[in-house]
UniProtKB/Swiss-Prot annotation:
The gene is murG. The keyword RNA-binding does not apply. HAMAP family: MurG. Pathway: Cell wall biogenesis; peptidoglycan biosynthesis. It is found in: Cell inner membrane. Coiled coil: none annotated. It comes from Polynucleobacter asymbioticus (strain DSM 18221 / CIP 109841 / QLW-P1DMWA-1) (Polynucleobacter necessarius subsp. asymbioticus). This is UDP-N-acetylglucosamine--N-acetylmuramyl-(pentapeptide) pyrophosphoryl-undecaprenol N-acetylglucosamine transferase.
Length: 357
């Protein structure tokens, strides 16, 4: 019996790639043949190859922030990408095509329609990206990571690693804790300077007996500067370039201060952990603000725009939050999670392909 096959399309950012990899791995375990369409010069190439999925390269990029030359070349570049996608799909003959977002999905989505291959879309952010908005008109099914993102779409949540869903319930975790609060800071790569500048200064304003313990993920690029800043301010902190086991780090934290990318917000909800979300202000379509408000509107997180970020107010916020407050916030966040998102996306793909998982 021939195995069912899927072509996953995603690229550009981790918010598109990582949920695609979660679905790809799930379907591979279920016995599907999985291939990936992406840009060989994008971050998806390294990530997908490291997971041992066949990679099909298409040359196509976005227009936002590009000059007039890129816009003038769009028809030629799109035609080339469509031709490449056509050859790939004619050869692979996938039972279903899954677009997870990013400009690279646009030519492949068009060709899936021409070749009468079922197209399923998944939008990770609270604000739909350009490619998904355009392709939604021809997709068989549209799925979203957040509610009320696109018309005629099913809110399934964002596919994440199973380890995030396996953590003990927040009420159980928080009730067992005593002593100073545990603070986890995830600086990320986008605009980390604002967090790295203000958070150590805020902690220095908190009296020693009230000061939380701190783990700060800095990234390799900012590690030495951040170590010096904490030391100069006399604040003891565990500063790491990277946290390998993020589910455990979330589970052990009382409060997380971080950006609000789609996957981060979904992981916070899955784990059930209180957070202070500081959206990256220059994200496309300001989607990080909308992502953060998904939790903050339900009193499941503190929403702090970067323009309002300063050490004095941040220190006051941390001091005013009790562990009981944080537990209640974490419980509300957990109630918004979609623990079976990966399975649901896979089920929809199988349904559109007319086969079982």
């Amino acid at each position: 019996m021939t195995k069912p096959s899927i072509l996953v399309m995603a690229g550009g950012t981790g918010g598109h790639i990582f949920p695609g990899l979660a679905v790809a791995e799930y379907l591979r375990i279920c016995g599907w043949n999985v291939s990936w369409l992406g840009n060989q010069s994008g971050m998806e190439y390294r990530l997908v190859k490291s997971c041992n999925f066949p990679f099909e390269a298409v040359e196509f990029g976005g227009l936002r922030g590009k000059g007039i030359k890129a816009k003038l070349m769009l028809p030629i570049n799109l035609a080339r990408a469509c031709h490449q996608s056509w050859k790939i799909m004619r050869r692979l003959k996938p039972n279903v095509v899954l677009g997870m977002g990013g400009y690279i999905t646009f030519p492949g989505g068009l060709i899936s329609k021409l070749l009468k291959r079922p197209l399923v879309l998944h939008e990770a952010n609270s604000v739909a990206g350009s490619a998904n908005r355009a392709l939604a008109k021809i997709a068989m099914r549209t799925l979203t990571g957040f509610p009320n993102t696109m018309e005629n779409a099913e809110w399934v949540g964002n596919p994440i690693r199973q380890e995030f869903d396996d953590i003990a319930a927040p009420a159980e975790r928080y009730e067992q804790r005593q002593g100073p609060l545990s603070l986890l800071v995830v600086g990320g790569s986008l605009g980390a300077a604002a967090l790295n500048e203000n958070i150590p200064a805020a902690l220095a304003l908190i009296p020693l007996e009230q000061r939380p313990t701190v783990i700060h993920q800095a990234g390799d690029k900012h590690l030495l500067d951040l170590q010096k800043r904490y030391a100069d301010l006399g604040v003891l902190a565990d500063i790491r370039p990277f946290i390998e086991d993020m589910p455990t780090a979330y589970a052990q934290a009382d409060l997380v201060i971080c950006r609000s990318g789609a996957m981060t917000v979904s992981e916070l909800a899955a784990c059930g952990v209180a957070s202070c979300l500081i959206p990256f202000p220059h994200a496309i379509d300001d989607h990080q603000t909308a992502n953060a408000q998904f939790l903050s509107d339900a009193d499941a997180a503190v929403f702090l725009p970067q323009k309002n970020l300063n050490p004095q107010d941040l220190a006051l916020m941390i001091q005013n939050l009790t562990r009981t407050d944080l537990k209640e916030m974490a419980v509300r966040a957990h109630a918004l999670s979609k623990p079976h998102a990966t399975q649901r996306v896979a089920e929809v793909c199988a349904d559109c392909a007319g086969v079982g998982i």
